[in-house]
Amino acid sequence: QAVAIGNHDCSSASYQNHFNNPNPFLEESTPTPAGNGYFYSYGNALFIVINANNYNAADHKALIEKAIKENPNAKWRIVVMHQDIYGSGLDHSDSDGIILRTQLTPIFDANDIDVVLQGHDHSYARTYQLTSDGQAHDEFLEYKQDQGGFNHDNFDERFEKDGVFRAYYKSQNLCYNIADKSQGTVVNPEGVFYLTSNSATGSKFYNLIPEQQDYVAARSQNWRPSYSVINITKDSFTVNTYDVETGEAIDSSYTIIKK
């Protein structure tokens, strides 16, 4: 079982008592008590698991570069992290999720990441192929904590009460371009594909943001658990997502072909 450290896991060492991850990135400058990011290869895919509770993007950049250097022949480069930077849930997508967006989007783009698997929003979302816009954006460093965390209370209060700040914050997080809106099967696409999983256990669900974001190709909240099945071959990455209770697909199939 290869898991990412979640926001409810990061403040204690309990996670480390349950999981013995391969290739832990011990060079992180601001790790959380739960541990570090790590990486592993499976078949022709390289999986890089980020501890996104650490808001120091330089650590994640270094981990990605190290993983790629040690696995130069991996056909597929897949990042896994708990926080979603391109989701569609009401509680996180427009707050702590996008505080990481301006930092991680160009890093993923520069390192030719194919897919980013995310959670956190307790709702399902699938994006188009996205690239960095190549522009400089505010990283809102005043809300980062010394240990690599994020000051949610101060940020949330200002975001809620200060309309000018809220508008500026959202404008700075328009740090992406939609590279390809094709559906079904895309061949040698530009950009990165982001998938946000809903709860697989049904422990908690969040509403979707009322207005679907332009980067979202499909989304769902039926208030029931769902799961995704990913099939990776030499030349293809395919994802299908199903309702746990009924077994029915909640979204159309999406395939990336790399020749």
Model-derived segments and their meaning:
Residues R101-D112:
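Catalytic-core regions built around general acid/base machinery
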Residues N71-D91:
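Short acidic, glycine-rich surface-loop motifs adjacent to enzyme active sites
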Residues G6-N7, H82, G119-H120:
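Active-site glycine-centered loops adjacent to acidic/histidine catalytic or metal-binding residues
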Residues V115-L117, W223:
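Functionally important transmembrane alpha-helices
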Residues D9, I85, S123:
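Short active-site segment of divalent metal-dependent hydrolases/proteases
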Residues Y42-L46, M81-I85, E211-S253:
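Extracellular low-complexity, Gly/Ser/Thr-rich intrinsically disordered linkers
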Residues Q1-N73, R77, Q103, Q129-A218, ...:
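Extended active-site neighborhood of metal-dependent phosphoesterases/phosphodiesterases
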Residues L90-I98:
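Short, flexible/disordered intra-domain loops and linkers
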